[in-house]
Amino acid sequence: MGASIYLGKVLSAGTKGCNIILPTAPSFVGLLDTYPNAAAAYSLRKLRTAYTGNCIRVRRSSDNAEQDFGFVNNVLDTASLLTFVGAGSGFVTTWYDQSGTARNATISTAVEQPRIVNAGVLDTLNSKPSIINPNAGVIRR
């Protein structure tokens, strides 16, 4: 006769139930939680557990409007980004420093801004959001 699971206990014929310990999802630990003394830190993933700021500020090509984007589940909120950009392209104007030193990287010249959305499609590398710099502009802090 096989064992059955009932309310967290394994029950089988002729034996008492025993507790089952199910693994829980690991807590998020950011890279900067382990290495807290960074002078500056930029990523499309959240790097510090306590960081509550935005990830990037993006300009959309259709009307040059700009908007900040944060994180969902510790990665860039790509759904909101794609909704904002629509069928056009999106360019990063500010990449926010997650180190806590406020050394945000900005680039105000539109033709030098790196792209993150191309014609409504998220730029990716190995299936991860990626910032592409087709014009070789430099983001400055």
What is the role of each PLM region?
Residues 124-137:
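Short carbohydrate-recognition loop motifs
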Residues 3-114, 136-141:
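GGW-centered surface loops in extracellular recognition modules
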Residues 117-118:
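Register-specific beta-strand positions within repetitive beta-rich fiber domains
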